[in-house]
């Protein structure tokens, strides 16, 4: 399949709209990090940092250079060039590397682990973002503290409740709102910088190095808070397919990066002048009369950040389903214009329950900060490893990348391992559950395919029998029948049962196999390969549909593009009733887990967009 990159040249008005759209979707997570990151750095559990000028300069320097190296250099300048037909994200990178010889197995495992860690990020981001915004109420009045939890829960319930409606209409406002948010961040930081211009010294990396040399253990633990400033960096890469690399780069360099630098410098200057502001430096930046509007704006910004990661979870899950890493799930489109706007009820329900539990267990953004880092840093390290495999560049460039980016990321990850007992176990638990689910689904599907192959008739033998006289006893139906099937050299079980048990033989038999390509989209003109296996009186046609992992598996639509006379075809699906050969109490947990997922996955009638009135399901019992 040919790779088709999105055109990078577009009218200026179009580029401006894409850049504004990127502000609303891509940068919500990293844009709300100032709400909690610096506060967390000075109140790290078991390692409280004294508020001195040297410590503030050192921490701000660590923050600014972490953003520069990881977000600007790694993601914006380097990793966004590793696209798969314009699409980004860790699974897109894995798809690019699938056929890299001896790296193939490692790449698959790394991609699975990265995807699993991302789900941990998706659970924590809405919780910590909304909590940090509502905690601004305590800056207005300490008596408002009792409202933080109920208000946070109410906001989160609203976020998940509106998911079935989609964000097509309100999504248009996300960009302007986030632009206002970034302008606000910059505007709040500038007066403090003017009042304490010495804070600009922290732009020099020597302050970070000085802190590391003077207090190595404290600096190491501080990295666990510093990483909070780059949460959402992966979104720059993952959402590249929606906006393109150029608008993301423009938004970063022209709006987001300057705003973040100014607000962190401003928070640092404020903390030096007013050490008591370390309790919540983001909200203390605002004049007293503007704190209520700031809390409202911050809450809206965190809602947008939450929506972005939830949408990312839908997108990643759809990729995983199409790549056969997860069972089929119901996917509903919430927009007639935007293909990428989808809603997955099961994913939404699981995320809702998980986020509610996390908020009720941790109850504050400070407590959740300990849980956040491992999910973020684990993904950072995995993307770096996969990127180095992808570029396969000269040794000195690899060494430079490792020194400037690899070593800092490993240190960030190592620092967060010290917080496993304080909450870091949460993303590890989520990732472990997801890996078990994905590996079990792969393992079980392979076993089913092996057992199924033994029951299926070889294609050549079936074609021979069509010419044999005993077929006269079969009832001929002068219509078209379509049989979706997973392989090209055997006959679908539904077709075998149709002929053997139902004594039916259709005038035209179309056997359709979906070939999942490791690209986001396959151009319509390159999707179908058709071969006529048998002519009159019974015509047998084999169709291979090559689809990308973002392409819809809409069989009637794809087959109409090949032959409109197939529009009224009857579809036959093979339904396997799986049983374990061992009694329920003896069967292994893996067997039971796979059988449970297989029984509860979405029906292929819905996945293939078939009309129930034109679909016949033929059952077969299979023992594993």
From Swiss-Prot:
What organism is the protein native to?
A: Corynebacterium glutamicum (strain ATCC 13032 / DSM 20300 / JCM 1318 / BCRC 11384 / CCUG 27702 / LMG 3730 / NBRC 12168 / NCIMB 10025 / NRRL B-2784 / 534)
Identify the Pfam families for this entry. Answer: K_trans, K_trans_C
Bilayer topology annotation: Multi-pass membrane protein
Q: What is this protein called?
A: Probable potassium transport system protein Kup
Keyword annotations for this protein? Cell membrane, Ion transport, Membrane, Potassium, Potassium transport, Symport, Transmembrane, Transmembrane helix, Transport
Q: Which family does it belong to?
A: Belongs to the HAK/KUP transporter (TC 2.A.72) family.
According to UniProt, the reaction catalysed is: K(+)(in) + H(+)(in) = K(+)(out) + H(+)(out)
One GO molecular-function annotation for this sequence? symporter activity
Gene expressing this chain: kup
Q: Which residue spans traverse the membrane?
A: 16-36, 59-79, 106-126, 147-167, 174-194, 211-231, 252-272, 292-312, 342-362, 371-391, 394-414, 418-438
Q: What's this chain's function?
A: Transport of potassium into the cell. Likely operates as a K(+):H(+) symporter.
Give the UniProt subcellular location, in the record's own words: Cell membrane
Instruction: List the HAMAP family.
Output: Kup (MF_01522)
């Amino acid at each position: 399949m040919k790779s088709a990159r999105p055109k990078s040249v577009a009218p200026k008005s179009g580029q401006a709209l894409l850049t504004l759209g990127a502000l609303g979707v891509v940068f919500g997570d990293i844009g709300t990090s100032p709400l909690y990151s610096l506060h967390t750095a000075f109140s790290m559990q078991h390692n409280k940092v004294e508020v001195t000028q040297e410590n503030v300069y050192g921490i701000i320097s660590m923050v600014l250079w972490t953003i520069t190296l990881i977000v600007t250099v790694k993601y914006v300048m380097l990793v966004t060039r590793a696209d798969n037909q314009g699409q980004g994200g860790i699974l897109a990178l894995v798809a690019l590397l699938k056929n890299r010889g001896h790296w193939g197995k490692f790449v698959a495992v790394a991609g699975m682990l990265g995807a699993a860690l991302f789900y941990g990020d998706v659970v924590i981001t809405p919780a910590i973002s909304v909590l940090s915004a509502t905690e601004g109420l305590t800056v207005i009045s300490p008596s408002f503290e009792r409202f933080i939890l109920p208000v946070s829960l109410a906001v989160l319930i609203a976020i998940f409740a509106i998911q079935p409606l989609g964000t097509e209409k309100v999504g248009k406002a996300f960009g302007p709102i986030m632009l206002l948010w970034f302008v606000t961040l910059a505007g709040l930081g500038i007066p403090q910088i003017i009042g304490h211009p010495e804070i600009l010294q922290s732009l020099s990396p020597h302050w970070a190095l000085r802190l590391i040399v003077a207090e190595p253990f404290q600096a190491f633990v501080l990295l666990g808070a510093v990483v909070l400033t780059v949460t959402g960096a992966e979104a720059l890469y993952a959402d590249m397919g929606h906006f393109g690399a150029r608008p993301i780069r423009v938004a970063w360099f022209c709006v987001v990066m300057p705003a973040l630098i100014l607000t962190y410098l401003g928070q640092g200057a404020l903390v030096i002048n007013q050490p008591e502001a370390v309790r919540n430096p983001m909200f203390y930046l605002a004049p007293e009369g503007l704190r209520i509007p700031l809390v409202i704006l911050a809450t809206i910004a965190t809602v947008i950040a939450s929506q972005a990661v939830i949408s990312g979870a839908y997108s990643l899950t759809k990729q995983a389903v199409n790549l056969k890493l997860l069972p089929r799930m119901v996917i509903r489109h919430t927009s007639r214009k935007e293909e990428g706007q989808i809603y997955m009820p099961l994913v939404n329900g699981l995320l809702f329950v998980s986020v509610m539990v996390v908020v009720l267990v941790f109850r504050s953004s400070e407590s959740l900060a300990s849980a956040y880092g491992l999910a973020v840093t684990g993904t950072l390290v995995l993307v770096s490893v996969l990127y180095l495999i992808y570029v396969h560049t000269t040794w000195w460039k690899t060494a430079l990348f490792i020194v400037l980016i690899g070593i800092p990321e490993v240190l960030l990850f190592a620092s967060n391992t010290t917080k496993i007992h304080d909450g870091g176990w949460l993303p590890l638990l989520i990732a472990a559950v997801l890996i078990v689910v994905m590996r079990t689904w792969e393992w079980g599907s392979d076993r089913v395919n092996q057992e199924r192959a033994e029951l299926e008739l070889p294609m050549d033998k079936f074609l021979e029998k069509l010419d044999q006289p005993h077929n006269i006893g079969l009832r001929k139906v002068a219509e078209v029948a379509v049989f979706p099937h997973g392989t090209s050299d055997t006959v679908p079980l539904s077709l075998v049962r149709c002929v053997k048990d139902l004594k039916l033989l259709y005038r035209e038999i179309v056997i359709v196999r979906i070939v999942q390509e490791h690209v986001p989209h396959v151009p319509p003109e390159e999707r179908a390969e058709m071969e006529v296996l048998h002519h009159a009186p019974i015509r047998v046609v084999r169709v291979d549909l090559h689809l990308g992992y973002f392409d819809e598996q809409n069989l009637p639509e794809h087959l109409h593009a090949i032959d409109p006379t197939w529009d009224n075809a009857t579809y036959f699906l093979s339904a396997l009733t799986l049983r374990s050969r061992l009694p329920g109490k003896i069967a292994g947990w893996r067997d039971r887990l796979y059988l449970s997922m297989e029984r509860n996955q979405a029906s292929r009638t819905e996945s293939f967009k078939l009309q129930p009135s034109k679909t016949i399901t033929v059952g077969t019992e299979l023992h594993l």
